[in-house]
């Protein structure tokens, strides 16, 4: 990934710009007329890595989400509450889908998978 580029003429920031005639990526100074060809066509890359536990922490009220299915066929190992919401997601480093449960006890919110 490239870092910020600066103009060789006036030391201001170079901004990505398309040369429409040649269909190439350039970096151009907005202060002077300096331009240079980009050595890489990637201007910005955003990689997002979240584990399922991070996703359920982001959704702190996941147990009260009315769109998620609920079951009374499981029992929480932490508080013995008999109701949980469940959803499927891919676990990090695993292929296929995994079934995740979140305890519906508002004082617990324990998460586990099967």
From Swiss-Prot:
Q: Which UniProt keywords apply?
A: DNA-directed RNA polymerase, Metal-binding, Nucleus, Transcription, Zinc, Zinc-finger
| Binding-site positions, Zn(2+) 2 | 76, 79, 103, 108
Tell me yes or no: is Transit peptide among this UniProt entry's keywords.
no
The residues that hold Zn(2+) 1 are 7, 10, 29, 32
GO MF entry, a single one: nucleic acid binding
Q: Which is an annotated Pfam family here?
A: Zn_ribbon_TFIIS
> What quaternary arrangement does the UniProt entry report?
Component of the RNA polymerase II, IV and V complexes. Interacts with NRPD1.
Q: Which PANTHER family match?
A: DNA-DIRECTED RNA POLYMERASE (PTHR11239), DNA-DIRECTED RNA POLYMERASE II SUBUNIT RPB9 (PTHR11239:SF1)
Provide the protein name: DNA-directed RNA polymerases II, IV and V subunit 9B
* Organism the protein comes from: Arabidopsis thaliana
Instruction: Provide the organism lineage as a comma list.
Output: Eukaryota, Viridiplantae, Streptophyta, Embryophyta, Tracheophyta
